[in-house]
Amino acid sequence: MAFELNGKTYETDEEGYLANLSQWDTEAAVYMAKEDDCDLDENHWEVINFLREYYEEYQIAPAVRVLTKAIGKKLGKDKGNSKYLYELFPYGPAKQACKYAGLPKPTGCV
Amino acid sequence: MSRAKKFMYINRHAPCGTVYAVEGLEVVLIGAAFEQDVCMAFIGDGVFQLQQDQDTADTGMKNFSPAYRALGDYEVNRLYVERESLQERGLTEEDLMPLTWEDEDEDWAEKSSIYIVDQAQLSDLMDEQDIILNF
Amino acid sequence: MLHTVNKSPFESSSLKTCLSLARGDADVLLIEDGVYGALSGSAHTSLVAEALGDVRVYALEPDLKARGLSRDRLIPGIEVVGYDGFVELACANDKIQNWL
């Protein structure tokens, strides 16, 4: 599967996750979010950028429990809780945000 | 809820030549979501999984060794490395990557996750477990 | 003859068997997990060090790097080669035996 944007083709798996991490750019993130009726604002980007940094360092996408705790440590308790994160990403913060961040589905997510 | 079960994942294979190491690590990360009492043991060639400075770029394989540093985030913070296995391979603790976890109860103090244990200690630890899985 | 060994000497007897059968004009190339046989200070170091008086032993650099093994950890006398060196060895020898 794939989608096209500004003449560039992005390969995806059957669930819409980018097949090739290095293809990711902000336009792709905005496009994938739009497909889910989600307009990315700065709060979304905060989480997306966090996930990309996490992947860069550890080579895995964190499970939701790990993400919540790490966000809390970095951005404060008012953001490091599942209510806040689920409001931003109603399909599941790890799953949905990882998709827009161009990462594979988090390890342990089914 | 019933009491958390004590899980030990035993890693016995070198990191790159087979899929045991990466598959085992994935199972540990997935299993950590179930909030059980999890530890890992590294024996035999498994101790090579913790070798510092692994760089797979020239082989075209993915380097998954940074993922061991995420284990602390998953609350897997007891990694037992068998002393005899290190010695047999000419390794010391200094050859291993430093792995730590942050103790939230002590203002995120960084603590080491690596414990070098001898065979007798490891046997005792195995006796304490409810479930032992080998990779 | 070129011999390649791709198993860890701690897991398999292939390195030991290979070295006991390799003749003086042989090249022995350690690849994949076989590169653990190049480690100095290990239980198998003496086996390889003794063979070095007889055969030439090489280790493949990308496989060493993938496993975090730097050159200073290797048994002196082992030559480190890249993929190009692997090809040269394969061409220079009339036969290849892979100790799988």
Question: Model regions: which residues?
Answer:
Chain C
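Short, conserved loop/helix-junction motifs that constitute active-site signature segments
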Residues: 20-24, 47-54
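Short internal beta-strands
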Residues: 27-32, 55-63
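C-terminal structural segments of small proteins and small subunits
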Residues: 67-100
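Conserved acidic residues
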Residues: 1, 26, 94
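Structural motif
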Residues: 5-8, 62, 100
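Short, glycine/charged-enriched secondary-structure capping and boundary segments
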Residues: 17-20, 42-45, 73-75
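Short, glycine-rich nucleotide/cofactor-binding loops
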Residues: 1-15, 34-40
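N-terminal beta-loop-helix "entrance" segment that forms/cooperates
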Residues: 35-49, 69
